[in-house]
Amino acid sequence: MPYILSIDQGTTSSRAIVFDANGHACGQAQKEFRQYFPEDGWVEHDAMEIWNDTLAMCQQALRNARVEAQQLVAIGITNQRETTVLWDRETGDPLARAIVWQDRRTASTCEALRDQGHENQVRSKTGLLLDPYFSATKLAWLLDNVPNARQRAEAGELAFGTIDSWLLWQLTRGKVHATDATNASRTLLFNIHEQCWDEELLTLFNVPASVLPDVRDSAADFGTTCPELLGAAVPVTGIAGDQQAALVGQACFAPGMVKSTYGTGCFMVMNTGEAVESHNRLLTTVGYRLNGKTTYALEGSIFVAGAAIQWLRDGLHLIRDARETEALARRVGSAGGVYLVPAFTGLGAPWWDPHARGALMGLTRDTGIAEVVTAGLEAVCYQSRDLLDAMAADCGTRPTTLRVDGGMVVNNWLSQTLSDVLGVCVDRPVVTETTALGAAYLAGLGVGLYASLESIAEQWRCERGFSPALAEPERQKRYQGWRDAVARVCQTSRGAN
């Protein structure tokens, strides 16, 4: 039986899963790592810690699966996107901690570029907005704030990459500096229509081309691992950013199909086939690129989903474990007019307000822990409604089904409430960790284990479906309360700036 090792490097943990050819997980390992918050709005990771943890999890997953490295036909990598690493080509050491996608330190830089009239140029080339979420201003910040970094970069001594590139560099011991089109499309430096790094954008963000990785298909030859790392030289043949990998893992291969992943953040992606320009502040991005052909997608990004539950646990100590949230929500049924707007690092799509900060509204003397926790879960659903409404407006048709995945959707109350708030059917697959599965599928395509996307689609199975059970007037009433709460948060942020 051939096996594929899938590396799933996320925002809060590094995971490795061994899959067989039928998409069944045979063994896995996962480890959380430290988050750094040196200043307000700053979020950093230790890239070397990520690499060491990832390697250890790969080794542990193989042991747990009782699979030898020689039995692996390929490795797939999926990763937190936009997070920016700058390292020394000679030593392989990072010059500074990685700047995470959630980091907002370059908000003023983005505002200045918008004020100078560059947003339309950037959007037309990249499909993205001028927002600190993306890699370009993070990279420019590192070049300008790490001593001698810009001079060394221009001399060809430094390499930039998102986490996939960083892991690939380490896995191949510096032999391969590459990324795939999905990760490149999240940097603000990549022209998604011409499928290349864009010289005008490099000039705009003051980034030297010498630091950039080679861009390849999502299923391609990305080199071979150094044998001593896993016990054998294994080809790396699939790479995709986490949300695009989930699109593949959910087998959303037809235009109009939508998936939403619920982890640290929430990310909804619709396969559009061709590029669709959003008029509702969604992102036009690369869904995947296979055999040189690009399939495009619309994406809405929510910065805080599961992270709100982590905050309730670690910041407020209202719960000890995320699994407690379902019982608490069932006890009260709803948040009872309490709204948590989790804008801890700004608001993502479709609001895109980097200055917004979190708020808890509608509190009364009767409000208790259960209502606050339930408001945290409901916020995930309301933000998802924001995204689905925007996608429907852009595409002229509203999807009737949403395929969901990620750690949060094992919560049946959340999945049902999601269906109630959105007014569409919600399908949860047998394999909810579809991000890792998508990376495995891409690696399998790259090595010839799968003949086509159609053969992958045949493996998708629904574990449970949820249908709307909330009356339309109540659905609209609750959602309007959310819209009012967000409007107040945005109004406050404008007043503060």
Curated annotation (Swiss-Prot):
Matching SUPFAM superfamilies: Actin-like ATPase domain
Activity control note: Inhibited by fructose 1,6-bisphosphate (FBP).
EC number, as in UniProt: 2.7.1.30
Binding site for glycerol: 81-82, 133, 242-243
GO BP annotations, alphabetical order: glycerol catabolic process; glycerol metabolic process; glycerol-3-phosphate metabolic process
Residue intervals passing through the bilayer: none
GO MF annotation terms: ATP binding; glycerol kinase activity
Residue positions binding ATP: 11-13, 264, 306, 310, 407
Keyword Transit peptide annotated: no
Biological role: Key enzyme in the regulation of glycerol uptake and metabolism. Catalyzes the phosphorylation of glycerol to yield sn-glycerol 3-phosphate.
Protein name: Glycerol kinase
Source organism of the structure: Alcanivorax borkumensis (strain ATCC 700651 / DSM 11573 / NCIMB 13689 / SK2)
